[in-house]
Amino acid sequence: MARIIDLVPWEDGSTHVYASPAILLPIPRRRNQLAGVKQQLYHPALPSLRRMDMDSVKACLSDEHCQSTTYCRKDDFDNAYFTLLGVPNKPLQCLDITETGQRLRNRYHEGKLAPIAPGINRVDWPCFTRAIEDWSRFVSSAGEFKLPCASKKVESFSGYAVRYLKPEVTQSWRFCLNQNPSLDRYGQKPLPFDSLNAFRRFGSNYSRVNYLTPWH
């Protein structure tokens, strides 16, 4: 905010200072080089991905791009900190050494921490040995089941959404378990042309499905 000051002459030859009402003058914000003010990992005013994309599309230089400049000063970075939402009842384990770590550290300083490398003792580790014995007993008592015969050319199942005929014949699924629209690693897949039709057809058993046809 700035004031325009005028010197108003009076009749006696003297001048008096006259201050006009305040006029807001827009002052452009100063951009600072990020490497000159930032010395830590935390950024108090991290630019958004949309702003970085816009600056990249506009081909901004390094002194105007938000990836290399910031409006924050060095004091903002030095005084930047983050706090948890309220005082936690139980401190996070990542903020300090845990109780187990404190006990192990005390035992290590006292020389009472024995190495575990030679082997696992049954007295010190009863839960591990008991789990091994229980698993061995469970595997021994489990019943056997017969695998399906691999000589059959067409396997038949009940209660599953599978093909009625071999894939080489139909080239299509009888039942589709994928929701529409579906997602892949690149985003949402395009909708087939008849997905939203009230009386859509899935094609015959001997025709290719719609998603195998090219998109126009």
From Swiss-Prot:
Key words of the record: Cell projection, Cilium, Cytoplasm, Cytoskeleton, Flagellum
Tissue specificity as recorded in UniProt: Expressed in sperm.
Any coiled-coil regions, as ranges: none
Domain of life assignment: Eukaryota
Pfam families: SPMIP8
Function noted in UniProt: Microtubule inner protein (MIP) part of the dynein-decorated doublet microtubules (DMTs) in flagellum axoneme. May serve to reinforce and thus stabilize the microtubule structure in the sperm flagella.
Gene (UniProt): SPMIP8
UniProt xrefs under PANTHER family: TESTIS, PROSTATE AND PLACENTA-EXPRESSED PROTEIN
Compartmental location: Cytoplasm, Cytoskeleton, Flagellum axoneme
Protein's name according to its UniProt entry: Sperm microtubule inner protein 8
Any Gene Ontology CC annotation: motile cilium
Subunit description: Microtubule inner protein component of sperm flagellar doublet microtubules.
InterPro entries: SPMIP8
